[in-house]
UniProtKB/Swiss-Prot annotation:
Keywords: RNA-binding, Transcription, Transcription antitermination, Transcription regulation. One of its GO terms (molecular function) is RNA binding. This is Transcription antitermination protein NusB. Involved in transcription antitermination. Required for transcription of ribosomal RNA (rRNA) genes. Binds specifically to the boxA antiterminator sequence of the ribosomal RNA (rrn) operons. CDD domains: Terminator_NusB (cd00619). It comes from Yersinia enterocolitica serotype O:8 / biotype 1B (strain NCTC 13174 / 8081).
Length: 138
């Protein structure tokens, strides 16, 4: 699959995870609703599904990875930033085929696209501290 299709999968995953985090609905229901309502042309659907289910199943452990380095309580973290960080930490911890730098750079780009003005700086700072403990640089 092309890198652009993976990027689109990540973009869609941020949006779907944002909805899931706010609604607390079952992730499978969120996925079905998202896929039926959104334009998913040029999206790596299999990767989108893997990100959604992987983050949902591992949310507590992903949050535990980031919590020690956050400058505020996890509950105070913006929903976009939380979704972006969870995706990056899922990729770093569970997807060895995704290079270290790619996971971080993609997270920064997602934060620039969906987050507040300085979200990308915050995401970069958190991942710079957490990523080396999750996976050796590749």
């Amino acid at each position: 699959m092309k890198p652009a299709a993976r990027r689109r999968a990540r973009e869609c995953a941020v949006q779907a995870l944002y909805s899931w985090q706010l609604s607390k609905n079952d992730i499978a229901d969120v996925e079905l609703q998202f896929l039926s309502e959104q334009d998913v042309k040029d999206v790596d659907i299999a990767y989108f599904r893997e990100l959604l289910s992987g983050v949902a199943v591992n949310a507590a452990s992903l949050d535990a990875l980031m919590a020690p380095v956050l400058s505020r309580q996890l509950e105070e973290l913006g929903q976009v930033e939380r979704a972006v960080l969870r995706i990056a930490l899922f990729e770093l911890s569970k997807r060895d085929d995704v290079p270290y730098k790619v996971a971080i750079n993609e997270a920064i780009e997602l934060a620039k696209t969906f987050g507040a003005a300085d979200s990308h700086k915050f995401v970069n700072g958190v991942l710079d501290k957490v990523a080396p403990t999750v996976r050796k640089r590749k």
